[in-house]
């Protein structure tokens, strides 16, 4: 390697570290946009993530890395919603604290397998009841379904309804 190549390599390494460690703001990113390592920056939880920053640098950001970023700012519906077409939903689904209302709003985008598998038992039951059309498409076997409390409630309700109907025909 030449001296210039070594200097360039070291400079890239410094910017990679700066990109992953500093609490960047939109103002700083505007000033240093050409030096920043955008992949590293996209996974940096210390960045002051705002809708304005995401809009301004949407074409530079690594959205796959950003989707795995656990920054609380990136879990906000106000940040997620406008960029629905950019997120990698398998990762975003895993790395966001979902409320029932926001699940309902973003149901078409969510990775239901990830959402369901990472959910608490209570949330799984809620998803099964409220979003059956999505959950029912997951690759479950018969035993998976039978272990669900909702399955038992459904069987009990249907049994009672049908038993009443059948017995109403007996004279």
What are these regions (language model features)?
Residues 1-171:
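Alpha-helical scaffold segments
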């Amino acid at each position: 390697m030449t001296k210039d190549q070594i200097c360039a390599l070291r400079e890239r390494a410094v910017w990679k570290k700066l990109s992953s460690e500093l609490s960047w703001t939109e103002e700083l990113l505007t000033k240093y946009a050409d030096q920043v390592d955008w992949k590293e920056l996209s996974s940096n939880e210390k960045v002051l993530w705002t809708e304005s920053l995401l809009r301004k640098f949407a074409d530079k950001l690594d959205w796959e890395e950003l989707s795995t970023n656990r920054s609380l700012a990136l879990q906000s519906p106000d940040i997620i919603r406008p960029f629905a077409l950019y997120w990698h939903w398998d990762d975003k689904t895993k790395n966001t604290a979902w409320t029932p209302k926001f699940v309902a709003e973003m149901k078409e985008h969510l990775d239901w397998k990830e959402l369901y598998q990472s959910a608490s038992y209570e949330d799984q039951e809620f998803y099964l009841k409220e979003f059956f059309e999505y959950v029912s498409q997951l690759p479950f076997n018969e035993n998976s379904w039978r272990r669900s409390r909702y399955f038992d409630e459904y069987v009990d309700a249907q049994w009672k309804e049908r038993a009443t109907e059948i017995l109403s025909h007996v004279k």
